[in-house]
Design a protein with these regions (language model features):
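N-terminal activation segment of mature serine protease catalytic domains
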Residues: 36-139, 187, 310-323
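Sec/Tat-exported extracytoplasmic proteins
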Residues: 68, 72, 114-118, 122-125, ...
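Conserved active-site neighborhood of the chymotrypsin/trypsin-like protease fold
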Residues: 99, 126-127, 133, 144-226, ...
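Sec-dependent N-terminal signal peptides
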Residues: 2-31
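Terminal peptide-recognition signature
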Residues: 119-121, 140, 147, 151, ...
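Flexible, gly/ser-rich surface segments that form the specificity/activation loops bordering the active-site cleft
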Residues: 133-135, 154-160, 200-254, 262-266, ...
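C-terminal subregion of chymotrypsin/trypsin-like serine protease catalytic domains
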Residues: 56, 272-323
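Extracytoplasmic
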Residues: 105-106, 113-120, 133-138, 144-146, ...
Length: 323
């Protein structure tokens, strides 16, 4: 749901092991008790154990579609028209408490800790437009265990092109969206509510300085059928800049530029610091070309909004003055 850029993820590893065992057997004789013990079979290489962790994006997409079809059969769901109307109302909300950031962690530990708090937001597209994707996916993250979700405002507005929408956690639970609690189209942030009471929330930090290491967990599209995304992809980078920019006709706003990669399908994903706390939210990409034909890509800006744009929607407004 963000603008796209050409990118490639590839990874490979190779493992090898060799075991040479020699034994001398004397005809009609057994080996003496003092002989060296038999060689212990080597343990499986680390790569072999990791094979079980490989996941099929196709199966995840199928799971999402199946759960969404079941969700569509439920009665009393809030209509997409109403959700879009709430997003356009540009309101704020009050959140009583947010989780505290924990200790500093390495990349693998951050992924393990934060992944359960990242969600897939998506829906099935309306109509039968030629070459149109059947399913459309975006990203989001939990900030309260009772079902408060953060994503982009443009993700919510995009619901109007879908028949049914839902939010799925990494363990395959599907939830309907019951309300848009708050939204800010200028900063492209929306706060959603889903029917849940045992989700894994991510802490939200105040800020991150330029040069700080950051991570992104999102669902970028793959160069395969459109219903396949690289669900729960982890990328790493740094905060490369903090700018006041005019974007999309809005007055200057705060932009957190990062080098952690993301692409279409990553909209609404968290930008995390080394404590696993949210310091920004993915919004868009901006490719820079070296020629008028836009063929020579020189670099791609990754623009997110700082966490302050999220916190601004969660702070309670001062009470109105009494007459």
């Amino acid at each position: 749901m963000t603008s796209t850029s050409k990118w490639l993820l590839a990874g490979a590893w190779a493992t090898g092991a060799g075991v040479v065992l020699m034994a001398c057997l004397l005809a009609g004789k057994t080996a003496p008790s003092s002989a060296a013990p038999a060689a212990v079979p080597p343990k499986p290489a680390a790569g072999a154990a990791a094979e079980e962790q490989f996941q099929s994006p196709e199966e995840t997409a199928k799971k999402f579609k199946a759960e969404l079809d079941r969700l569509a059969e439920r009665k009393g769901l809030v209509s997409i028209v109403e959700l879009v109307r709430q997003a356009e109302a540009q309101k704020t909300t009050t959140i009583e408490t947010l989780p505290d950031p924990g200790q500093k962690l390495a990349g693998a530990a951050i992924y393990a800790k934060a992944r359960p708090g990242v969600v897939i937001i998506g829906g099935n597209a309306k109509g039968k437009r030629r070459r149109a994707p059947e399913m459309i996916f975006g990203s989001g993250f939990v900030i309260r265990k009772d079902g408060v979700i953060v994503t982009n405002c443009h993700v919510v507005i995009g619901f109007q092109d879908m028949k049914t929408v839902g939010v799925m956690t990494d363990d395959g639970r599907m939830f309907p969206i019951t309300a848009v609690l708050a939204a800010d189209s200028r900063n492209d942030v929306a706060i959603l509510k889903v029917e849940a009471d045992n989700l894994t929330p991510l802490p939200v930090a105040e800020s991150a300085p330029v040069g700080a290491k950051v991570y992104c967990i999102s669902h970028p599209a793959l160069n395969t059928p459109e219903t396949e995304n690289g669900f729960y992809t982890l990328t790493e980078g740094v905060v490369s800049g903090k700018f006041r920019l005019r974007l999309h006709g809005f007055p200057p706003l705060n932009v957190l530029a990062v080098t952690a990669d993301y692409a279409k399908g990553s909209s609404g994903a968290p930008i995390l610091n080394e404590h696993g706390a949210v310091v920004g939210i993915v919004c868009e990409t901006l490719p820079l070309y070296g020629d008028a034909q836009e063929q020579d890509v020189q670099m791609v800006w990754k623009f997110s909004r700082p966490s302050s744009s999220i916190l601004a929607l969660l702070r309670e407004k001062p009470p109105a003055a009494k007459p």
